UniProtKB/Swiss-Prot annotation:
Pfam families, per database record: Histone
Family: Belongs to the histone H2B family.
Compartments reported by the entry: Nucleus; Chromosome
Protein name: Histone H2B.1
Residue segments, region Disordered: 1-38
GO CC, alphabetical: nucleosome; nucleus
Compositional bias annotation for Basic and acidic residues: 1-19
CDD domains, per database record: HFD_H2B
Modified residues (N6-methyllysine): K23
Gene encoding the protein: HTB1
GO annotation (BP), single: chromatin organization
The organism of origin for this protein: Saccharomyces cerevisiae (strain ATCC 204508 / S288c)
Coiled-coil zones: none
Length: 131
């Protein structure tokens, strides 16, 4: 036999299995465990999409990308606001720290619009809780 006939095609090693999230299964006492909930911004992203483009849909992949984007921006703003509070020797993150963090993280015109929308949202929330 030749050397080529003896060789087997290279096979891929099986991927390691990762522990899965809680699945619905019966435990020792017969009760079903519910699946672990994963919090996303999907419903909010969808509502905004329908406000701006009522006849447009969105794929799961696109929704996943937007969800990752929102989580990333949220984390950046929270981290920056935390640093600002620490610099000023405060243990509480206020609207002022969030606003400053947004100005530092987002570029130019985008920061201005974000600050104005944020201020408007806080004002609307404050007036609704007082009434």
């Amino acid at each position: 036999m030749s050397a080529k006939a003896e060789k087997k095609p290279a096979s891929k090693a099986p991927a390691e299995k990762k522990p899965a999230a809680k699945k619905t299964s019966t435990s020792t006492d017969g009760k079903k465990r519910s699946k672990a909930r994963k919090e996303t911004y999907s419903s909010y992203i969808y509502k905004v999409l329908k406000q701006t483009h009522p006849d447009t849909g969105i794929s799961q992949k696109s929704m996943s990308i937007l969800n990752s984007f929102v989580n990333d921006i949220f984390e950046r703003i929270a981290t920056e606001a935390s640093k600002l509070a620490a610099y000023n020797k405060k243990s509480t993150i206020s609207a002022r720290e969030i606003q400053t963090a947004v100005r530092l993280i987002l570029p130019g015109e985008l920061a201005k619009h974000a600050v104005s929308e944020g201020t408007r949202a806080v004002t609307k929330y404050s007036s609704s809780t007082q009434a």
